[in-house]
Curated annotation (Swiss-Prot):
InterPro entries named among the record's database cross-references: GABAA/Glycine_rcpt, GABAAa_rcpt, GABBAa4_rcpt, Gabra-1-6_TM, Neur_chan_lig-bd, Neur_chan_lig-bd_sf, Neur_channel, Neuro-gated_channel_TM_sf
Name of the protein in question: Gamma-aminobutyric acid receptor subunit alpha-4
Transmembrane segments: 260-280, 285-305, 319-341, 518-540
Topology class, membrane: Multi-pass membrane protein
Main location: membrane
Entry keyword Repeat: no
Activity regulation behaviour: Potentiated by histamine.
Pfam families: Neur_chan_LBD, Neur_chan_memb
Amino acid sequence: MVSAKKVPAIALSAGVSFALLRFLCLAVCLNESPGQNQKEEKLCTENFTRILDSLLDGYDNRLRPGFGGPVTEVKTDIYVTSFGPVSDVEMEYTMDVFFRQTWIDKRLKYDGPIEILRLNNMMVTKVWTPDTFFRNGKKSVSHNMTAPNKLFRIMRNGTILYTMRLTISAECPMRLVDFPMDGHACPLKFGSYAYPKSEMIYTWTKGPEKSVEVPKESSSLVQYDLIGQTVSSETIKSITGEYIVMTVYFHLRRKMGYFMIQTYIPCIMTVILSQVSFWINKESVPARTVFGITTVLTMTTLSISARHSLPKVSYATAMDWFIAVCFAFVFSALIEFAAVNYFTNIQMEKAKRKTSKPPQEVPAAPVQREKHPEAPLQNTNANLNMRKRTNALVHSESDVGNRTEVGNHSSKSSTVVQESSKGTPRSYLASSPNPFSRANAAETISAARALPSASPTSIRTGYMPRKASVGSASTRHVFGSRLQRIKTTVNTIGATGKLSATPPPSAPPPSGSGTSKIDKYARILFPVTFGAFNMVYWVVYLSKDTMEKSESLM
């Protein structure tokens, strides 16, 4: 029989034992948890490996999905990361894209705890993938840095997602008739290389409107604006069958700022500069020649430089027409100056012929001498010197005037005549040259014009007044009419020593100065015509829809 004192001690020991047992169980559980997690993880990895091995077990990547059965449908979409540049000379464009393809391969169905198997590019080589290629691509590059930029995913129902990062250089046919106000639709065409549409077709993943995405920040174009894109599909026939071709059109419109600064404004300023020559005097031949030649050379340089940024097309562009018309205006300004100079020279030649027409020559009439006692002495020599003879007459007249103041007029007059005739030696008169010869024409004219003019009254009465004294009346009667005839004859002698019917012209020939009528018309006609051309040109091309249609490229 157990005593009452031992009962509490037994109960206490039982409670301690239960607590120790619980502690030991907890310690055992804690020691077994890491191993169990690792085991579960090991079991999960083994499950994925088992799943992939089971998928590839007996899988032939040389055969398309549904081989021999239904058509394989490949859904595609494109995300553009960078668009540009666009080369007009090469007629191509470059862009970076994420090219996505989706199809269903029932051979890759699986059952597992994970919805999507996210795999790397190593799996791509072990399964079938579409043989998509870009029909108008000149060069396509798949990026491999730092590893091949490829994404591959398998879903439970066998749907495959395959994404690649590509840089594509594709052909862009351009018709540059409206250059630089043109717009282009650059296509990107892709399809199957080997499978006809009876085996594989392409469709858009998100429909025609949203399957191609081009963010605004992705377009880095200098000469173009990317205004949108459209998609389409078509069937192409070949000797191997009919193939489905998917096409994306990127619509580009050219920016005109560069060409306005580089070509249009310089051409307009050159034409205006060529028309400044119309306001320069037509006698300034060097200045107008420099204007014309400089502007023609400038237009030639501009036309050559404008073609550097274009392919060597065989047709004329809108810029070519503008440059050609500007060149025609500049060249016409040079031709206009040539015409002005030509007609001015003709007018000057006609004026010179009128003013320099030689006067009608008349034979010199012999001077008739009055009969007086000294006539036999003077007729002994036919070549009497007119200048010496005139000086002798003037000297005799002066002596007679001095003697008139102290003596009788009639007696001293006869004495003067005798002294005058005696004072001239016969040998001197005989040796004197002909006063009307060419050599002595100038001297004779000077001597005769130095004589005082005689009025009709003095000629008739033989009396001529003097400043210091009055001449003899008898001397004027004897020599007055002769002196008058000599002076009249000398005044009719021209510069060549010949007698002329009319005196030489006093006004100089016209120099052709002034403004030409051609210049007056050109000052109005050229600017008005050039302004009208610019108005028509810009109205036509700016209001015209120059964007290429997508249908024209198909």
